[in-house]
Structure formats: structure tokens, C-alpha cells
Amino acid sequence: MNTRRFGIIGEKIAQDYLRKKGYEILETNFYTKRGEIDIITKKDNCIIFIEVKTRTNLNYGTPAMAVNSNKKKNIKFVAKIFLSLNRLKEHEIRFDVIEILIMEGKCKINHIEGIM
């Protein structure tokens, strides 16, 4: 299975998890020339921008470790565009990472809130 297809599976798992936790999914795969945000949700008065990282092992560290400072900068930039386009500037905002680890037929989800 290629990396992109595997990532899509992880994003679907994350979306199901978020819905069960009471998040309203506003948009998925929001693209701009500068980058992309995997999932944008709303809960209470907070807009949450979520990066999903899916892995099958921990050989290169935890999935969240792949969200480096450059990636964080791009996510923040893209988030500003989304907020402006959708006139949502009055909301609180938060940036999260959801780690999906799929090993030996089992799926582990780790939701890290407020990573930036």
C-alpha cells in the first residue's frame, strides 16, 4: 500500500474518532499553495486544526515527531487563510496532532491537544 493511501486510511480513522468525541468536522484536506490541513473541526467555540500522522512502527520516533517547526509554520499560515475565508476570526483556535499507530492488526490513537 502506498504512503498516500495509508495516510488516507489514518485520516478516516481520525475522523471517526473525532465524531465519537463530539467534534463537528468542518473540512478535510483543506489545500492552499502553501500547504494542507488534514482535518478542521469545531467543538464548543473553538476551531481546531488537526494534523494526522499514521505509522506502522516507531522506527523513526512517534508520529507527532514528524510535525517539525517548518510544518507547524505552514499549518498556522494555512489556518489563517481558512479563518479569513470562512469569517471565523472570532473563535478560539487550537492546533492538535492525532497519531495513528497501526501494528499487528491493532490501531492505537493518541490525540495530542494544543501542540503549537
Where are these regions (language model features)?
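Acidic-basic catalytic patches of nuclease active cores, encompassing PD-(D/E)XK
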Residues: 1-28
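Residue-level signal for inorganic ion chemistry
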Residues: 18, 75, 95
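Basic, glycine-rich
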Residues: 21, 31, 100-103
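Short acidic/glycine-enriched loop/turn segments that link adjacent beta-strands
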Residues: 32-35, 106
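Conserved catalytic cores of phosphodiester-cleaving nucleases, focusing on short active-site segments
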Residues: 37-59, 67, 75
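Mid-chain, well-packed structural core segment of small domains
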Residues: 60-88
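Domain-level recognition of nuclease-like catalytic cores that cleave nucleotide substrates
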Residues: 84-116
